[in-house]
């Protein structure tokens, strides 16, 4: 799914980033910034210790002040936009892959919500890339060729359903 999205962004070019999606009126640039931000978070949490807390605290502080997630990610992005954002996001995709490919799948990692296993964390990254990727394809009026590669996403949806009611 990451490759599909990367190929689409490269084909459309950085100009497509200003396109508004149907998800909360986020632009494609907002979406890619969001994916980039939390890819970095996924790498930081795998490091253990205070790495994740140090990453997430400034974002959470903004959320506590009433900022939206997009507004909270702006200081973290520090002016990274356009093609550089696409490139930095893609590097973060590769960093997540490299970090998790040999990780103990049962290792517990911190996150904004409850801790989860490394296996669940990487599945969550896959799920988020798939879902936000679909929103980008839809915003650009493009069809995405679906393949039988989302079993883990469906599994995550089933096991996480109960957690979805915690924040209501």
Positions of predicted regions on the chain:
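Amphipathic alpha-helix face/heptad-repeat signature
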Residues: 1, 31, 85-92, 121-128
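A generic secondary-structure signal for well-formed alpha-helical elements
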Residues: 2, 9-12, 35, 39-46, ...
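Generic alpha-helical secondary structure signal
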Residues: 3, 15, 83-87, 94, ...
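Helix-loop segments that flank and shape redox-cofactor active sites
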Residues: 6-27, 48, 52, 99-116
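Active-site-proximal cofactor/substrate-binding loop regions of enzyme domains
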Residues: 20-44
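Conserved small/polar residues in nucleotide/adenosyl-binding loops
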Residues: 34, 166-168
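Short, helix-capping/interhelical loops that line the mouth of catalytic, cofactor-
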Residues: 40-97, 101
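Structured surface interface patches that mediate subunit assembly and partner/cofactor docking
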Residues: 47-59, 80, 102-166
């Amino acid at each position: 799914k990451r490759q599909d999205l990367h190929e689409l962004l490269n084909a459309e070019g950085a100009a497509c980033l200003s396109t508004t999606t149907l998800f909360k009126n986020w632009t494609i640039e907002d979406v890619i910034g969001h994916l980039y931000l939390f890819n970095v978070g996924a790498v930081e949490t795998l490091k253990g210790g205070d790495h994740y807390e140090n990453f997430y605290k400034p974002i959470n502080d903004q959320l506590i002040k009433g900022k939206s997630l997009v507004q909270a990610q702006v200081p973290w992005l520090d002016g990274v936009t356009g093609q550089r954002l696409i490139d930095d996001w893609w590097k973060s995709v590769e960093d997540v892959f490299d970090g998790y490919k040999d990780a103990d799948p049962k290792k517990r990692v911190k996150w904004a919500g409850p801790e989860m296993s490394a296996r669940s964390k990487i599945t969550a990254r896959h799920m988020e890339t798939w879902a936000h990727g679909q929103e980008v394809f839809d915003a650009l009026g493009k069809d995405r060729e679906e393949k039988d590669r989302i079993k883990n996403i469906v599994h995550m949806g089933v096991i996480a359903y109960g957690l979805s009611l915690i924040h209501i």
